[in-house]
């Protein structure tokens, strides 16, 4: 059980402790001509990506060709989901590197579906510098490591300023009059719907997305501590709790968003993460629960100008102000060899994902943020995965150089994190995806049936998820 709570501590901190390798190489210097292998890159941009992004990765590939001339890199874009990855891993067709969310590593590790990179990390001189929490999250029970952090995120809310302006919800300073609370969100969304005809809030309620977002709403209604959605009893058994007064109130609020305030997008039950960003970016919705790591989706990808976009803190509820903190990691095929593991660590170093500082890495950072700016994505302060002061200062200086937004549209979001005015909370500690699936079904029922019984639906989901907990953990 200590493993789960140590995993939580890392996500809340959104950082890990690593020190920089004490030397670096010139970009065109051969580092290891003997290393010979092929690696497939699941983190390669898709064919539909902007030319600048594809050029950036071609540059990384060229650098690897100079430093490791006998390592072959094969672009192999892959959009991860647990359901499609498992058969790939079992069928020996998984890419060498891929990018799952922080919810999945322990499951993948326990099932033997990912590759061990411990020895490669030791070869790069960083193995002993990992924080205990990091090891607990991406390691097995023997301390063998299977992944590296890519980035972290904090859930907030994306705003389409054009719709706020059309609805008359602007301050004298020309800033959106954004909602500070969930109640204000409902009321402002109603005004927007009435005055513009567009959805006040896009809520993706397909697959597991609805339950995922609902948990953050539930926390802000008080589903934490002794009222948590899941907890361990005195015997160490995991118990789910969907029928507390707090959870019932949160789900009633969810129902009201559809039937009382009528602010949701019409096709919520079939809307996914990408669809939600599309609706906001194309002006079909004014608000979307989303994080700082996806600000490029409605802007660069869907055409919303950066001066028509804002990122705000997750609205507070009647019993708290929490925001989900999570992230994405790099993990590796279970079939990788020792040489492939070393090549993959070298590749991540070239990408600037390890805290090395040299001219090549700084040049890569510049190219990364320049590409974001050039394709119309907001260039924002980073929530760093590293605590190395020199590395973070260099990165922030480059961000400042390429910043292309009015930071007043983002300041409250970042200030709420740095000043601690919002409490960061990681995802539910055990079988989160199954929990989301059960709660998504309840959300779907609430927003499609006006007279749906909240307590009955939550009790049914509670019984189903408890049976799952018993089968998969308590009685195992």
Please report, for each region that a protein language model flagged, where it lies by residue.
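C-terminal lobe and pocket-closing loops
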Residues: 294-305, 319-324, 328-437
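Short helix-initiation/N-cap motifs at beta->coil->alpha
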Residues: 76-85, 180-184, 267-281
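Alpha-to-beta junction loops
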Residues: 89-100, 113-115, 198-199, 281-291
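Hinge/lid segment of periplasmic solute-binding proteins
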Residues: 29-31, 101-156, 162-165, 180-188, ...
């Amino acid at each position: 059980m200590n493993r789960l709570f140590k995993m939580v501590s890392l996500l809340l901190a959104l950082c890990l402790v690593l020190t920089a390798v004490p030397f670096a190489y010139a970009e065109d210097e051969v580092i290891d001509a003997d290393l010979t292998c092929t690696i497939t890159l699941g983190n390669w941009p898709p064919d539909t990506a902007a030319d600048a992004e594809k050029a950036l990765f071609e540059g990384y590939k060229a650098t690897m060709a100079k430093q490791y001339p006998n390592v072959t890199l094969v672009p192999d874009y892959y959009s991860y989901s647990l359901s499609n990855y498992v058969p790939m891993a079992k069928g020996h067709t998984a890419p060498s590197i891929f990018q799952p969310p922080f919810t999945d590593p322990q499951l993948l590790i326990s099932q033997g579906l990912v590759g061990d990179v411990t020895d490669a990390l030791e070869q790069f001189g960083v193995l002993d510098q990992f924080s205990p929490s990091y090891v607990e999250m991406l390691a097995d029970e023997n301390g063998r490591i299977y992944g590296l952090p890519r980035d972290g995120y904090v859930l907030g809310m994306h705003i389409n300023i054009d719709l706020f302006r059309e609805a008359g919800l602007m301050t004298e300073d020309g800033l959106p009059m954004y909602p500070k609370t969930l109640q204000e969100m409902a009321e402002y969304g109603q005004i927007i719907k009435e005055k513009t005809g567009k959805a006040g809030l896009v809520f993706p309620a397909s697959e597991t997305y609805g339950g995922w977002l609902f948990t953050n709403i539930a926390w802000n209604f008080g589903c934490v501590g002794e009222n948590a959605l899941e907890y361990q009893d005195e015997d160490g058994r995991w118990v789910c709790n969907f029928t507390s007064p707090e959870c019932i109130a949160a789900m009633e609020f969810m129902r009201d968003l559809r039937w009382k305030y009528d602010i949701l997008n019409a096709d919520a039950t079939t809307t996914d993460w990408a669809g939600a960003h599309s609706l906001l970016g194309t002006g079909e919705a004014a608000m979307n629960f989303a994080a700082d790591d996806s600000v490029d989706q409605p802007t660069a990808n869907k055409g919303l100008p950066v001066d028509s976009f804002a990122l705000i803190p997750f609205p507070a509820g009647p019993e708290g102000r929490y925001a989900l903190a999570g992230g994405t990691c790099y993990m590796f095929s279970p079939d990788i060899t020792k040489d492939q593991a070393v090549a993959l660590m070298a590749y991540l170093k070239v990408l600037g994902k390890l805290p090395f500082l040299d001219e090549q890495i700084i040049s890569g950072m510049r190219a990364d943020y320049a590409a974001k700016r050039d394709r119309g994505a907001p260039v924002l302060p980073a929530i760093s995965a590293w605590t190395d002061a020199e590395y973070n200062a260099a990165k922030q200086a480059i961000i400042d150089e390429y910043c292309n937004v009015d930071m007043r549209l983002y300041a409250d979001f970042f200030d709420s994190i740095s000043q601690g005015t919002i409490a960061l909370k990681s995802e539910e500690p055990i079988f989160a995806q199954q929990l989301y699936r059960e709660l998504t079904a309840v959300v779907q029922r609430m927003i499609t049936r006006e007279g749906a019984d909240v307590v009955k639906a939550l009790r049914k989901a509670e019984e189903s998820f408890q049976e799952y907990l018993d089968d998969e953990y308590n009685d195992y």
